[in-house]
Amino acid sequence: MAEQDYYDILGVSKDASEKDIKRAYRRLAAKYHPDVNHEPGAEEKFKKINEAYETLSDSQKRAQYDQFGSAGPQGAGGQGFGGFGGGQAYSNFGGGFDDIFSQFFGGGGRTRRDPTAPRQGRDLQYAMTLDFMDAVFGKTTTIKYDRDAECKTCHGTGAKPGKSPITCPRCHGAGVITSVRQTPLGNMQTQTTCPECNGTGKIIKPEDRCDTCHGAGHVHERHELEVKVPAGVDDGQQMRLQHQGDAGENGGPAGDLYIVFRVTPSREFRRDGSTIYVDRDISFAQAALGDEVKVKTVHGDVNLKIPAGTQSETNFRLRGKGVPHLNGNGNGDEHVTVHVKTPKSLNKRQREAMLAFAAASGEDVKGVKKTVLDKLRDAFEDK
């Protein structure tokens, strides 16, 4: 099933301004907030709205989404490019569901975050080193990294199978301890997070705690994941793998994994985006007379025609011989710069040929030390 477009989810056009996106998000979040809308599917709709807003409200993530979409350049679900950033899917205004809700409907100030509300897990980052050619053409590889995963025994509840958390006896489920003290200005009421339940309003009896996670609801694990690196990635780019980060809380989704690519430089090629640059030495004769020479490209050797009279530092473009574009639309180009090399020493025949060339060109090359044979030839020619 195809992923719904983020712009469609928020009901805005692709050229919508940040204000338009924020306005649409507020309107839809208020409509589908779980505390307001109890219809089937409303909570799932609310999650999609938050996911769409999280991407479109961030200029870097939005730019990457516009180019690659939510599925990423290779079309695999849940992969895409974007800047690394922490945060939670439900905290776009600095708080949880209740913070957002209070901004829509007032309430006399900032409300306390609901400790039982679903919260997205922490995002993780993984640095992947790639050989130059693997970055150009892509590869499939397996990575291993540490993450907090939902406990499979208790499915995140923290309690043994058949057991459930109970209402905190200290705060009676409120999650906070309320105290009133007298001041010169009158009675002042304060609230502090309940130390017994850490603000959740629920506790698990020691004897009821899950034997696997000991009541945490998640376990630390070494996770193995197959990653398809798309052709055309570059050094410093990042790819997001959705829901491959730390486990969420209270039924919230897992965080994302951001893979940062580190590409090893090539000894033969220089790269700028999808363009490849190479140097090719040619001789004076090849430059003057023209020739056809072999040139290295990332796609293999190709023949390059050198026109007669080519000057040193001349640049030739080989269309389509560069790096594949990330969007899958063809390849970049390769630029070949030729360098005419002057020989450091000449054998006898080469020297004679060069002197003859100079003479035929009407050049009197100063500083050329003549051999005995040259002097005899000059003597006979003078007679």
From Swiss-Prot:
Matching SUPFAM superfamilies? Chaperone J-domain (SSF46565), DnaJ/Hsp40 cysteine-rich domain (SSF57938), HSP40/DnaJ peptide-binding domain (SSF49493)
Supply the alphabetized keyword list. Answer: Chaperone, Cytoplasm, DNA replication, Metal-binding, Repeat, Stress response, Zinc, Zinc-finger
Q: Which Gene3D superfamilies match?
A: DnaJ domain, Heat shock protein DnaJ, cysteine-rich domain, Urease metallochaperone UreE, N-terminal domain
Which parts of the sequence bind Zn(2+) 1?
C151, C154, C210, C213
Gene Ontology MF annotations: ATP binding; heat shock protein binding; unfolded protein binding; zinc ion binding
Q: Which domain of life is it from?
A: Bacteria
Q: Could you give the domain comment from the record?
A: The J domain is necessary and sufficient to stimulate DnaK ATPase activity. Zinc center 1 plays an important role in the autonomous, DnaK-independent chaperone activity of DnaJ. Zinc center 2 is essential for interaction with DnaK and for DnaJ activity.
| The protein, known as | Chaperone protein DnaJ
Q: Which organism is it from?
A: Limosilactobacillus reuteri (strain DSM 20016)
Q: What is the lineage of its organism?
A: Bacteria, Bacillati, Bacillota, Bacilli, Lactobacillales
